[in-house]
Regions:
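Terminal targeting signals and extreme-terminal segments of soluble enzymes
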Residues: 3-281
């Protein structure tokens, strides 16, 4: 579901859509919401990070004030049509003393395009520890803007530091931010982080990636450890874990510029390398 696929864009659409617009949902009866199509994207299919963020936003609108998203797991089941609205149906699995669990189905024409499970918690002070540290990379202020396909579509800015590990087609380590200001609501900001989390792929560092073609997302999990502001520069650092059975999996971390670990993520994608008959023995 990455925006870095070889998607056909409508060049006549020149004004990027804001992420804030994407997260504006129309409430419907019975814990349902509607996300209207955003025609200015110029896309034929929906970016997976968009619908995941919209589903998480819908869930957040059904929990008590003060409960903030801390994890989500989405399955991408069908490609979505960017010209059509999305209906988001929320199921209230549990509301406990501190935690709330939700499931969300995103549908178009009664067909599920995404299924998401997520959890919210009332913030609490606790032990602070992170084993992974911000990589030693150039700060965004020393870099020039990198043109992602997504930057033509949404109000995003990317900058790519020098990377000692080679990558193919998609940068696997990059600074990202949302340009237009999001509300200070911590759940809206969490949705903004989720929106950014699916823009590239750690499989760009995997062996034989140049033979794999498109690598649409199958499922995507994000754990939100600390509050962050996606209007500030965030470093997304992605690394492959392995490929097998026509699929690949990678993990990643998202840091703020000060080095705080804001989120961790894991994604499985298609990784279909054509079988070479000459390799048979």
């Amino acid at each position: 579901m990455s925006l870095q696929s070889r998607e056909v864009f409508d060049a006549s659409q020149t004004m990027p859509t804001t992420v804030n617009e994407v997260l504006q949902l129309k409430p419907l009866p019975h814990d349902r919401f509607s996300a209207e199509p955003v025609s200015s994207t110029g896309r034929r299919t929906i970016y997976g990070g968009q619908v995941a963020a919209q589903a998480l936003r819908a869930a957040s609108l059904t929990v008590a004030d003060g409960r903030v998203a801390h994890s989500m797991h989405a399955y991408f089941l069908r490609a979505g049509d960017a010209s059509r609205p999305i209906e988001l149906r929320v199921e209230r699995d549990r509301d406990g003393g501190r935690y709330s669990g939700r499931r969300v189905s995103a549908l178009q024409d009664d067909a599920v395009i995404l299924s998401l499970a997520c959890s919210f918690a009332r913030p609490k002070q606790g032990a602070e520890f992170q084993a992974v540290q911000l990589p030693k990379v150039q700060p965004p202020g020393e870099l020039t803007t990198y043109q992602l396909n997504a930057s033509r579509t949404f109000d995003l800015e990317a900058r790519v530091p020098q990377d000692p590990d080679p990558w193919y087609r998609w940068p696997a380590r990059l600074w990202l931010r949302i340009r237009n200001t999001l509300p200070e609501d911590p759940n809206v900001r969490a949705c903004g982080v989720v929106f950014l989390s699916d823009l590239c792929t750690g499989l760009s560092r995997a062996p034989q990636v140049e033979k794999a073609g498109l690598m649409p997302s199958l499922d995507h999990a994000v754990w939100l450890h600390r509050a962050g502001n996606p209007n500030d520069w965030l470093l997304v650092d992605l690394n492959p874990l392995g490929t097998s059975g026509g699929r690949g999996i990678y993990s990643g971390h998202i840091f703020d510029e000060g080095g705080a670990l804001l989120a961790s993520l894991t994604q499985e994608s298609l990784f279909d390398v054509p079988h070479d008959a000459s390799d048979q023995r």
